[in-house]
Amino acid sequence: PADIESMTVLKDASAGALYGARGANGVIMITTKQGKEGKTKVSWRSTAGWSSRSLKAYDMVDQKEFVQLTYEGLRNGYIFDNGYNWEAAGRQASADLGGVLGGEQYNPFKNYTWGTIIDPATGRVQGDATSAWNESWMDAIQRDNAFRHEHQLSVNGGTEKTKYMFSLGYLNEDGILINTGFQRYNARANINTEVNKWMKTGLNVSLSNSTQNFSDYEGSSNSNVWYSAQFMAPIYPVYIKGEDGKDVLDADGNRQLDYGDGSVQRPQYSDFNPVGGLVDDKADIKTDVAGLRTFLAFGSDSEDAGWAKGIKLTLNFGLDYRNKSQKSYMNMHHGNQAAAGGLLMKYNRRTQSYTFNQ
């Protein structure tokens, strides 16, 4: 973007006259910056910033509210569907609560069991119930402030007859999701020269290389990390917990992600962890782009142009090359490709195009 001087939109006849059928929907003409006569000038431009969600997340129920609502749903089902009275429905709902929520392994209130967490007198969660863990799935998959920085070096100058502009750029942007981001290198050379009174030529070459790391899950699939993290019940921990509610560490002293596939299956999103989906699985797109624009202009109105006076002819040639390579890896141990033994996919597309007009 720092190399762009101006943009012009061509529509209808003007676009068709230059590009024929390819310009039927209009053409956007981008003019890049060119060298200026004078001493060589070197400039450096850097920007930095942070990215975050543009909209505040919705308020979510907490652990006690979730248990309370689950209990009420069970109790009301027994009352309206099975004809139980209030007391009998409450007792049955309390008895069934652990089976619905995944057993004591997923009970964060270690001073009560699932069968006693509801006060039978009030039908509400015990007031002195204390939680052994309270982990936010959305916080676990996101960066609070994703850092972005961009740098541009440009060299500009020239003589009366030859002008030049060179630029180098670098962009690094962290994604809002952990282990995602975008990185790009770009370069440009723009040279214009007046060969003699009746001939001018120019060359504009641009190169870029970019890598995008992203989450390959989308839609409303359970393996979509945005979807599953928002819908995961707050009682379920991100990391494996012991009977005392504390983290179970591996041999190296690191916390272990809970995939819901232990001795007791997690009722919700079993064998999947949104954080693990971003750590264990990989997806990236690498793109190489090269562009070349050159022109050769003949003719002049100058008296010194000799035989070329009054003749005007301009030849324009453009060449574009793009190579896009995408790789996706989904691990064999957890997630929606575990049953298939994992998944490795590679996709490559290379395109070339050219434009010539006069």
Please identify what each model-predicted range represents.
Residues 71-73, 320, 324-325, 341-343:
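Eukaryote-specific, cytoplasm-facing alpha-helical/coiled-coil scaffolding segments in long proteins
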Residues 221, 254-257, 261-263, 333-356:
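Solvent-exposed loop segments that connect transmembrane elements
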Residues 36-178, 216-219, 246-248, 252-261, ...:
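Residues embedded in well-ordered regular secondary structure
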Residues 3-6, 23-54, 159-246, 277-328, ...:
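Transmembrane beta-barrel strand/turn architecture of Gram-negative outer membrane proteins
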